[in-house]
Amino acid sequence: MIIAIDGPSGAGKSTVSKAVARRLGFSCLDTGAMYRSIAWQALQDGVSLEDGEALGRIADMHEIGFSHEPGDPLPRRVSIAGADVTDAIRTAEIDRSVSAVAAAPAVRQALVAQQQRIGRAGNYVVEGRDIGTAVFPEAELKVFLTASAAERAHRRVAQNERRGVGSTDYAEVLADIERRDAIDSSRDTSPLKPAPDAVQMDSTGRTIEQIIERICALAQEKGMHV
């Protein structure tokens, strides 16, 4: 079974997806981490972020790995080419780079194939930008989660402060979110938009717990539990 959670940067997808997966006994797949990993590898290799074909070759060559920390049922460590990039892919540099990588059709083709192989192996909450529209259009439950750009910027700053990575300058983070929204929504391949049958949720002014409870209730209505 698949629960697809889509939405723009900073909407709370990661926090919500992990909590929903934990409560339902599902695993969780962060597809954004996969695109970030390709961006990181491209920068390491000196590949231009405007060279879509070269970016696609990187995605074709490398399987993105996810691993568990002791005692944690959800995969949290991310690796590519044998390197643990869990923290490295959360920097401001990757924030600025990932939308260009995700817009490359060859990258999306390669990573969507990886995502489908992973998700079809079990019960997953899958988060990203195009899960309900392109990766798993057959998902049993689709959610499109959003919030105002200002709200998302505040959340991202707080998240970066907790992690100790990424920018903590509100104006810089807000500008980056607005830039990424424009790129993600206007790209030719799998633009950011809700699936026709997605449940749309605006989390502005609502607690993350309220969103989690709503999604879990919808999942249980559909008999989605282990």
Give the residues covered by each predicted segment.
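Hydrophobic anchor at the beta1->P-loop junction of P-loop NTPases
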Residues: 3-5
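The conserved Walker
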Residues: 9
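Conserved lysine of the Walker
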Residues: 13
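Hydrophobic positions on the alpha1 helix immediately C-terminal to the Walker A/P-loop
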Residues: 16
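N-terminal phosphate/diphosphate-binding loop that engages ATP/GTP or pyrophosphate donors
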Residues: 22-90
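NTP-dependent small-molecule kinase module
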Residues: 79-86, 157-162, 182-226
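ATP-dependent NMP and nucleoside kinases share a basic, alpha-helical "lid"
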Residues: 86-162
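An amphipathic alpha-helix signature
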Residues: 149-157, 161, 170, 174, ...
